[in-house]
Every structure is written in structure tokens, then in C-alpha cells.
From Swiss-Prot:
Boundaries of every EF-hand domain copy: 24-59
Binding site for Ca(2+): 37, 39, 41, 43, 45, 48
Domain of life: Eukaryota
Protein name per its UniProtKB record: Parvalbumin beta 4
Entry keyword annotation includes Metal-binding: yes
InterPro entries membership: EF-hand-dom_pair (IPR011992), EF_Hand_1_Ca_BS (IPR018247), EF_hand_dom (IPR002048), Parvalbumin (IPR008080)
Length: 69
């Protein structure tokens, strides 16, 4: 799903980071999820997804309706 979106080297590095059994860091995953899930509902709603780029930079644009469907 990320092929063509992320660089192959980045995908390989992410997979290598949790290649060993029991090495997946769920705390890091949920930290990232919590940043996007701004209302802490346990779901990422469309309105939160629209603001996804702003988690990287406050001045980033909001995604359009078409981009979040």
C-alpha cells in the first residue's frame, strides 16, 4: 500500500526496524495514531484526516474532500 508513496529505502528501514519477533513498537504506533486522532475517539474521522498534513507543519494546507474519500 505504501509502495509508490514512500521511498523503497524508507519502507525497508521501517520493516527492518521491526523485523525481529517481538520488536514491533506498539507505543510508537499509538503515539502516531493519537496525533492524528485529535478527539481521542479511537477513530480517525474525515475532518481529522483533512488536517493530517498539519501534523507535520502548522502552515500546511488542509486536504480536500476528494482527497479524504
Amino acid at each position: 500500500a505504501f509502495a509508490g508513496v514512500l521511498a523503497d529505502a524508507d519502507i525497508k528501514a521501517a520493516l527492518a526496524g521491526c523485523a525481529a519477533a517481538e520488536s514491533f513498537n506498539y507505543k510508537t504506533f499509538f503515539k502516531f495514531f493519537a496525533i492524528i486522532d485529535q478527539d481521542h475517539s479511537g477513530f480517525i474521522e474525515e475532518e481529522e484526516l483533512k488536517l493530517f498534513l498539519q501534523t507535520f507543519s502548522a502552515g500546511a494546507r488542509a486536504l480536500s474532500d476528494a482527497e479524504t474519500k
